[in-house]
Every structure is written in structure tokens, then in C-alpha cells.
Amino acid sequence: MKRIMYISTTTRKLTDEEVEAIGRKSTVNNAKVGVTGVLLSANEFFFQILEGEEEDVEGVMERIRKDPRHQGLLILKAEYEVTNRLFGNWSMNTVRLDGMSDMLMQAVRIMLENITETHRIIERYTQPAVLQFMTEGINPLTVPVKKTEQVILFGDIVAFSYLSGLFPVEEVAELVNLFLDITSKKIAEHGGQVTKYVGDCVVAHFPPDRADDAIKACVETLREIQELRQTAGQCRLQKYLYCGFGLSKGPVIEGNIGSSIKMDYTVLGDIVNLAARLESLTREIGKGIALTEAVRDACGESWSFVHTGDFNLKGQNASQPIYSVNDPAVVDMKNFQEISTIVSELCCELT
């Protein structure tokens, strides 16, 4: 059997009658498929434990995910090969904690609130792959390191060190967060996973058959940033936000890397380093995307690829052809020298 524990919040405040109705309906539906459990309700929080055959539990969870009264569903734990039920006599017992004066019940309500808040915070600092393992009932620390094929994305802000020395620290931090937010959302929308942030850099990976999606994430990011530049005021740092992306494809080491103090679930290898070299190359070729022949050949969609030349990149044994994409947002690129010249001219005008 399978057991799932989750927390969710309600999209609006529910009355006692509505919560009781949810409990009654759940009891009837769960009894039909042999699912047992308990539902705790405290203010806007639902905490529920479901147990039964895996297919039946997943069916109940699918209905819950689609229920418009739930939002922010967070699976705390999933257990497989469960042999004994914790709530064998309850198809769904509902416990309403609101309004109870009993100190124990109040403590439980506060605990649920704190658990939810803590998990939401941890989510923001944790790689999606690690969260996925946890929701599947897998201890991430036990996942073995493996060799796999991936499309690697490496991106960062052009002339960041120079710009960060000219503008207020608050505006610099805002710019980095903005860049990482836009890029990360595009990566996630197209099926990639952010592996890590290193200063103003983002490292992500896509499955080997999703090279098109990796390019889409880069192109759409560049388009959105181009729009930001066009609408920003002359003295705003966003006016000078340019970024570059390197895309490579090949074998990487994927898994837990770190120490007893701090672990990362990440990717390592020559292909990751190559993506970083390609990102740096974008300044030289004057285009926001630089990608390898392997990435180009893995694409299934009709892209307007441009051969930017053959380059002998650091760490590579021989020169190799490098490509970009012919898109207005991709070719709207400036290097460090061009950005510093624009900023210097602006400073002269202001003084």
C-alpha cells in the first residue's frame, strides 16, 4: 500500500458546514475504493493522511489537486510498501481544530501552520529534483550518483561586476533577482531544472531530447529582457541589462555532491564547463546565445541557426563549430566595452 501526508491551504475561508460536508463526501468516496485516513482542518490549512492501494490513493490525490478549494498543495511525505494502516477504521475522519479551547488542539494548529511556513521557505532554497524525491518518499541523501545525458544551460549578466560598482547595492540586488526570476521561470516552463545559482549566474539542465525547449527558454528570456530595457528609464540599471547563454549537450555526472555540512544535487563534467565557456563567448560573437553542434543536431524544430565560426575553447582538445539563433532579441547584444561606453556617456551628460 501507499501512504501520503500533505498540507494545503484553502482558496477562501470555509465554514464549519462546508468542512463537514467535505469530510462526509470524502468518507463516502474513499470507502468505495478502500482508502482510509484522517483530515485535520485549522484556519486556512488542511492536513491530510491518505492510505490504501497506490492506484487508489493517487486517484484521490488527483481529485484533490483539481479541487478549486485547495491551493498550494504540499506533499510532506510519501511511503510505499506500507503493510499496516494507521487509520484502518476511518474512511475519512475529519477533525476541526478551529475554535477549540483545548491547549493540545491549539498546539496542533500552530504546529501545522509552522510546518507549512517552514516547508514553503525550504522550497525556495532547494533544487526541484530534491523536492521531487521527497514527495515520492525517497530520501535524497540515498540517491546514488549517476552518469546521464543532458542539455546544459549556463547564463549570466554581461558586465555585471562593472555595473554593480556604479549603482546602489539595492538596485544591483533587484537586477540579479529579476534576471534569475525571469530565466528560472522560462526554464521551468519548458521542462528544465535549475541546478544552482552562482552570483549572477544560473546553471540548469534539460533532458537530452528537449534541446528545442532549452533554446526556447533562452530566446524567450532574451525577448523579455529586451522589453525591459526598452521601457526602463535612462538612469535605471535595467536599461543596461544584457545577458548571454551557453548551451551544450553530452554526458554529465548527476547526483549529490558536497560535504557533511552542505550537499547539492547537481551536475558536473566537461559539458557543464563547456556551457560556461560558450556563455562567455557570446560577448565575442555579439549574440545572446552560443550553442554546440550537438545541441543543434538534437533539435527537431526549424530554427534559423547561424554558424558563428570555429573556436578552440578552453578545456577542449580541438576547435569546434559554434552556432547561434537568428532572432532579433538574440542579436540585440552588447559586450562589456559597449556597455561601459554607454554608461560613461550618460554620466558625462548628467554632470
Where are these regions (language model features)?
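Catalytic cores and conserved motifs of cyclic dinucleotide signaling enzymes
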Residues: 16-21, 55, 274, 286-290, ...
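A short glycine-enriched loop-to-beta-strand structural element that forms part of the catalytic core
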Residues: 74-76, 80-85, 238-256
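Short beta-strand
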Residues: 37-42, 193-197, 237
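Alpha-helical scaffold within the catalytic cores of cyclic-nucleotide enzymes
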Residues: 68, 177-191, 208-245, 270, ...
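Charge-rich, low-complexity N-terminal segments
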Residues: 1-154, 162
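Catalytic NTP-binding/metal-coordinating core of nucleotidyl cyclase/transferase enzymes
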Residues: 142-213
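A short beta-strand->alpha-helix segment at the C-terminal rim
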Residues: 228-238, 245-251, 279-310
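Intrinsically disordered, glycine/charged-rich C-terminal tails and inter-domain linkers
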Residues: 124-125, 132-134, 285-351
